[in-house]
């Protein structure tokens, strides 16, 4: 049975703004207080989805969340009507209001970790929504994420959508941004690669000194257990703490994998040679031949990688076996990074094509092409069981573009977050969207 990788991109929400909430994410904190353009952000994301769909890749959409999250504000002691809750939070705790209004769920690489049926003990596709415990504004996402995923992957004979891990620092989980999978074919058993920043209980592992390590070893191990993965099909690796301190807050900022290929920086992992050898051995046992493409720091420094988001790219398998790499415009703006990419495409290796997308609205918050998508490997029967309304088509693209035009502002400044009308606009937009995507009632305001 044929199998495919489907990329489910996050649809940017109506409250997309620059509040600088993500300590350790250099782009996020560098653009704090700038005015954003939610309409442009959503359209940039949609254009990437449509372009890849037009190239023949399987593409889906993951809905944004209700923001501001009034329920979270109420839990923090802000009372009254919805408008009064927002007004009081704006006056007494504007940073908390900004966190409750964040559109960060657009980066669906953090939505969940996904294991395909070929890897799991029960033969189902498994999803574990990430608790995103390290940042308050992201930690409130997972209940809605789970409801949305269950509306998309509703057939419980084929799909298992777990609850998030305990929302506690020892099990800090950032989802697929620290996970990739190697395989000879998407429908064959593969090797799942879990990257962590620190261990919560084992003091032998080093930790970064400046920025937090958001993913723990214990969280990665728990997800592997939940998904029923075998030891023969799992590799754990620790990200180099120095790269975390250089702004590599998720592993998808310093490496990207697909199929039998890992594209990574020289300083991506601790004990890098041993890590690569373990992947190669385990993949060979599952019928694959591993290729590691290592970018030397002499050609691209960690700092250049962070600024350009070279590794926060998408590797996509083309017919014939070669791969396309999707990078943000910032890579073309860096002379050394662009020079490296041109050399890479001409090298005769597995990556032979580079595609550039303008994702500036997302990039200014620290999210490139890889951040915006959740990869789900599905066989034909599983793909047929997915809610068809969330799969990209010419009609869905036109419908979503019109939806954005009707509901999104083209400018959102920090002071606008105090406007109670923003909540009304967001709820109206999402109520219509659940109809377009066939999700049913998934948002708190719909469930009240």
UniProtKB/Swiss-Prot annotation:
HAMAP family: AstB
Self-association and partners: Homodimer.
GO molecular function: N-succinylarginine dihydrolase activity
Active-site residues, as the UniProt record annotates them: 174, 250, 371 (nucleophile)
Keywords tagged on the record: Arginine metabolism, Hydrolase
Similarity section: Belongs to the succinylarginine dihydrolase family.
PANTHER family in the cross-refs: N-SUCCINYLARGININE DIHYDROLASE
A Pfam family this chain is assigned to: AstB
Catalytic activity: N(2)-succinyl-L-arginine + 2 H2O + 2 H(+) = N(2)-succinyl-L-ornithine + 2 NH4(+) + CO2
EC number(s) recorded for this UniProt protein: 3.5.3.23
Name of the protein described by the UniProt record: N-succinylarginine dihydrolase
NCBIfam families cross-referenced by the UniProt entry: arg_catab_astB, PRK13281.1
Function: Catalyzes the hydrolysis of N(2)-succinylarginine into N(2)-succinylornithine, ammonia and CO(2).
GO biological process: arginine catabolic process to glutamate; arginine catabolic process to succinate
Pathway: Amino-acid degradation; L-arginine degradation via AST pathway; L-glutamate and succinate from L-arginine: step 2/5
Binding site for substrate: 19-28, 110, 137-138, 214, 252, 365
């Amino acid at each position: 049975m044929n199998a495919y990788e489907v990329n489910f991109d996050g649809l940017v929400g109506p409250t997309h703004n620059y509040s600088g909430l993500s300590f350790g994410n250099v782009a996020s904190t560098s653009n704090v207080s700038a005015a954003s353009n939610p309409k442009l952000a959503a359209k940039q994301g949609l254009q990437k989805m449509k372009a890849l769909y037009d190239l023949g890749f399987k593409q889906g959409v993951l809905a944004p969340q209700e923001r501001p999250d009034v329920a979270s504000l109420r839990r923090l002691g802000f009372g009254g009507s919805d408008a009064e809750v927002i007004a009081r939070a704006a006056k007494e705790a504007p940073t908390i209001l900004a966190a409750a209004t964040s559109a960060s769920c657009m980066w669906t690489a953090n939505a969940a970790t996904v294991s395909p049926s070929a890897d799991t003990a029960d033969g189902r596709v498994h999803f574990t929504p990430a608790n995103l415990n390290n940042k308050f504004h992201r930690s409130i996402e997972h209940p809605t994420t789970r409801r949305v995923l269950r509306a998309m992957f509703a057939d419980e004979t084929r799909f298992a959508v777990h609850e998030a891990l305990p929302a506690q620092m020892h099990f800090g989980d950032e989802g697929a941004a620290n996970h990739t999978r190697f395989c000879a074919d998407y429908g064959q058993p593969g090797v799942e690669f879990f990257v962590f920043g620190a261990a919560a209980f084992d003091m032998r592992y080093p930790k970064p000194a400046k920025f937090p390590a958001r993913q723990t070893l214990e969280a990665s191990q728990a997800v592997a257990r939940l998904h029923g993965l075998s030891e023969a099909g799992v590799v754990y690796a620790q990200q180099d703490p120095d790269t975390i301190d250089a702004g590599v807050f998720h592993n998808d900022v310093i490496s990207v994998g697909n199929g039998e290929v890992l594209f990574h920086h020289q300083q991506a992992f601790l004990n890098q040679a041993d890590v690569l050898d373990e992947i190669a051995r385990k993949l060979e046992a599952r019928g694959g031949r591993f290729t590691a493409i290592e970018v030397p720091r002499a050609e691209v420094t960690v700092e250049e990688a962070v600024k350009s988001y070279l590794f926060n790219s998408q590797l996509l398998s083309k017919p014939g076996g070669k791969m396309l790499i999707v990078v943000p415009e910032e890579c073309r703006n860096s002379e050394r990074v662009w020079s490296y990419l041109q050399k890479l495409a001409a090298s005769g290796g597995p990556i032979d094509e580079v595609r550039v997308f303008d994702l500036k609205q997302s990039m200014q918050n620290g999210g490139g092409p890889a951040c915006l998508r959740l990869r789900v490997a599905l066989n034909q029967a599983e793909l047929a069981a997915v809610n068809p309304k969330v799969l990209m088509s010419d009609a869905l693209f036109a419908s979503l573009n019109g939806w954005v035009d009707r509901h999104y502002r083209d400018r959102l400044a920090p002071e606008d977050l105090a406007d109670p009308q923003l909540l009304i606009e967001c709820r109206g937009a999402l109520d219509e969207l659940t109809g377009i995507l066939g999700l049913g009632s998934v948002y708190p305001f719909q469930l009240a």
